[in-house]
A protein has these predicted regions:
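Terminus-proximal functional modules
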Residues: 1-83
């Protein structure tokens, strides 16, 4: 089962980010989060964004990225990639 994702979209509605916990990590001392980046293609909501990259960060670093994006005008949004 995939971890619940948390989503952000930029103010131009051209890019999205999905933050999900990496439940498969074997590190017993740190939690890790995947940050998936995608580009909106076509009409938003009609087609899934094009996945451009996946990066993995420690939880604290992922929180800093989230906060930085929010400060730059990104907003929470609903899921845009299917399960």
């Amino acid at each position: 089962m995939m971890a619940r994702g948390y989503w952000l979209i930029n103010s131009n509605r051209t890019e999205v980010r999905r933050f999900t916990e990496n439940r498969a990590s074997e590190d017993q001392f740190n939690k890790y989060v995947f940050v998936d980046s995608g580009k909106i293609v076509g009409v938003f909501g009609k087609e899934a964004p094009l996945l451009q990259r996946r990066e993995e960060f420690k939880l604290d670093d992922a929180r800093k990225i989230w906060e930085k994006l929010i400060s730059q005008g990104w907003r929470r949004t609903e899921e845009v990639w299917s399960k």
